């Protein structure tokens, strides 16, 4: 066999393995959804409490409400006390569960002592690191970002540091009890080069790599650590997009994503978003990085937010 033939065979084999792996992951999701549902008491078996950052609205509140429906007491942490109180009342009314609130601004450095004091000693079975912010509502190039120095500081603190610090606070108890789940909310755009969302996308890549490494370190301790990477979810961050075949309500997405808790250290949270992720990842990088794509994507977000 000539060198050229060997190269062609190896290239074809690699392509088949990659494609086969993607098909296998979809089959695993279908099998899990249809034939391997989580036991009814799964979440309460992990511990009494669930802690959710960014839990006053959107995906965070949906996680809090769903975990409360599953029988857990929940702690929601967010910046605005008034929004926290409203969310807590709504969750308690809808589920009859116990809700505790902690007001904390995750763009700040000095909040973690306060958080630790309020959750220390609790039997925490689930941690959802959901809190996150965009550097600007309309995507733009890095140097066009308003108050760039402040935005850099806020993004690193809120999207990156908060996840690491919350894991640092909660993980020791989970390790001691040899049970627990940590869900770190990322984004589908972390899977591709994403100019004009550079800061945000890069922060979510950190979420994915940190979570993968942490899962490898602690899976033997009975702890599940998973990245959840949605695409379209109708929240304030996405301008309350109208739900459709691709865009989920926060409640729909959370219910779906929890079904795939045992499918590995990463999930898009739904079969629809998994297929979308495969399509997006197949787009050539030069297309995603082109000025034309950046312009049209920026215009799409502007028009979406005007609706």
UniProtKB/Swiss-Prot annotation:
It is found in: Endoplasmic reticulum; Membrane. Substrate binds at residue 187. NADP(+) binds at residues 47-76. PANTHER family: 17-BETA-HYDROXYSTEROID DEHYDROGENASE TYPE 3 (PTHR43899:SF7), RH59310P (PTHR43899). PROSITE patterns: ADH_SHORT (PS00061). The active site is at residue 200. Its EC number is 1.1.1.64. The keyword Lipid biosynthesis applies. It is an enzyme of class 1 (oxidoreductase). This is 17-beta-hydroxysteroid dehydrogenase type 3. Expression shows strong sexual dimorphism. In female, highly expressed in ovaries, and at lower levels in skin muscle, eyes and liver. In males, strongly expressed in liver and at lower levels in testis, spleen, kidney, intestine and muscle. Belongs to the short-chain dehydrogenases/reductases (SDR) family. The chain crosses the membrane at residues 6-26. It comes from the Eukaryota. It catalyses: a 17beta-hydroxy steroid + NADP(+) = a 17-oxo steroid + NADPH + H(+); testosterone + NADP(+) = androst-4-ene-3,17-dione + NADPH + H(+); 3beta-hydroxyandrost-5-en-17-one + NADPH + H(+) = androst-5-en-3beta,17beta-diol + NADP(+); 3beta-hydroxy-5alpha-androstan-17-one + NADPH + H(+) = 5alpha-androstane-3beta,17beta-diol + NADP(+). Catalyzes the conversion of 17-oxosteroids to 17beta-hydroxysteroids in the presence of NADPH. Favors the reduction of androstenedione to testosterone. Testosterone is the key androgen driving male development and function. Cannot use androsterone and androstanedione as substrates. GO terms for molecular function: testosterone 17-beta-dehydrogenase (NADP+) activity.
